[in-house]
Amino acid sequence: MSSGAPSGSSMSSTPGSPPPRAGGPNSVSFKDLCCLFCCPPFPSSIVSKLAFMPPEPSYTITEDNKLVLIEGRAAWPHQEVDMANCVEMRITRTRRRNRVACTMIRPLPNSHFTLLFSHGNAVDLGQMTSFLYGLGFHLNCNVFSYDYSGYGCSTGKPSEKNLYADITAAFELLKSEFGVPKEKIILYGQSIGTVPSVDLASREDLAALVLHSPLMSGMRVAFPGTTTTWCCDAFPSIEKVPRVKCPTLVIHGTDDEVIDFSHGVSIYERCPTSVEPLWVPGAGHNDVELHAAYLERLRSFIDMEASAIRVTAPITNATSTNSRTISNGTSS
């Protein structure tokens, strides 16, 4: 293996979403669900109790913006690579006055795109750094990521409102501090990370969007078969994705035990700029990236489809993949 390559010939599983408690959201007790969704006027704060599971911080940040992993909580297996040479840390502040920890990972020189990665609900940046380095190496992309409020070295408490403020602050830092223009930023959201990714993509014109195991909304995860977005619903990505204007790749395992496969299909169908999706037969919520098709599809998406599709007019009823208009006047 050439110098600087991540250890191993394939991607290791992300620690992004460890097995959920009691079998995941679909097996939460009726009492828990009543407490979760039927206690206005603060449904979003109640949702947070089940949606967010921040671990004990796995890292610290030095005064000169270096990442220090805490032994026993996170590891850097790439022995041939000096982490200090390719990983930079920053702290930014959100509009809700929380401090958010961010990392810029540069596995290779002269990468064209930067992934803005939003991780799962039970990890922090320290635990994700090794995976993000490997992902960037295999895709020839820089990777910029951040911790949600209440995770890692970020202050505050995790909540839906903070999710949106966190990604906005990270996005602004990526542009201002690192000089990355919008047209070279690819959003990548995994699991709960698809929620802020869809929100930002619905407001900004970016290079592309990757949605890995997305959810339609909180109510639809907790109550399978729900077809209406209620006023108390949290994380309503299904209502925002029709406003996305950049090429969008949806990835989902057909046997996902946490966020049902139907969520990925519905997000794909509602997005006016979705490209050929990656449905991984037999994959669950935590092992999609172990399949060879994962990296293959991401490479082709980034090399051939990122920045290629643009919606020319707002989509008012994007319910079918046959109702998409793209900039060259063709349909897909």
Swiss-Prot record:
Gene3D superfamilies noted in UniProt: alpha/beta hydrolase (3.40.50.1820)
Outcome after substituting D256N: Impaired starvation-induced thermotaxis plasticity
Enzyme class at the top of the EC tree: hydrolase
Main localization (coarse): membrane
InterPro entries named among the record's database cross-references: AB_hydrolase_fold (IPR029058), Hydrolase_4 (IPR022742)
Bilayer topology term: Lipid-anchor
Catalytic activity: S-hexadecanoyl-L-cysteinyl-[protein] + H2O = L-cysteinyl-[protein] + hexadecanoate + H(+)
E.C. number: 3.1.2.22
Residues covered by region (Disordered): 1-24
Keyword presence, Cell membrane: yes
Catalytic residues in the record: S191, D256, H285
Stated consequence of mutating S191A: Impaired starvation-induced thermotaxis plasticity
Documented effect of changing C39S: No defect in starvation-induced thermotaxis plasticity. Impaired starvation-induced thermotaxis plasticity. Loss of localization to neuronal sensory endings
Subcellular location field: Cell membrane; Cytoplasmic vesicle membrane
UniProt PTM comment: Palmitoylated on cysteine residues located in a cysteine cluster at the N-terminus which promotes membrane localization and localization to sensory neuron endings.
Effect of L36S: No defect in starvation-induced thermotaxis plasticity. Impaired starvation-induced thermotaxis plasticity
Compositional bias ranges of the Low complexity kind: 1-15
Stored PANTHER family: ALPHA/BETA HYDROLASE DOMAIN-CONTAINING PROTEIN, PROTEIN ABHD13
Family to which this protein belongs: Belongs to the AB hydrolase superfamily. ABHD17 family.
Function, as annotated: Hydrolyzes fatty acids from S-acylated cysteine residues in proteins. Acts in sensory neurons including AWC to regulate starvation-induced thermotaxis plasticity and salt learning behavior.
Protein name: Alpha/beta hydrolase domain-containing protein aho-3
Organism: Caenorhabditis elegans
Gene: aho-3
